[in-house]
Amino acid sequence: MRTMENENLRVQISDHGAELSSIYDKAADREAVGIGDPAFWNRHAPVLFPFVGKVNGGFYTHKGVKYPMGQHGFARDNEFECIENTENKTVHRLVSTEETQKVYPFDFAFTVTQELSGRTLTITWNVENTGDDDMYFSVGG
């Protein structure tokens, strides 16, 4: 778990899925992104990539090859590498591997940056196509 903190907020981000897990408002003395009940839902604010939503029938075809894809892609279920973590900035990266290419045949680097300034948390997603083919994707969170 990575933590960013200033005089207003304490923010926690998991390396698993680069998921925002907690925003604690110090002035209000309350959790803004609550810890859910894992009996019902064990996520908080998942990052969705390379698909948002379901693909028809759980499969899609690219260049004549059929690929399985679960709802909302796979990023939320993968460990991201934390490449920066300071009191006001956290950067996570997920890159394509042999495993991701079994379901998503593209070379990519997906970076999630969270920056804390005052009472504002800014989240930036950057998708880089590191291959030669056109890459189709969507991002959500």
Residue ranges and their predicted role:
Residues 1-126, 130-141:
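Surface-exposed acidic/polar loop and edge beta-strand patches at domain peripheries
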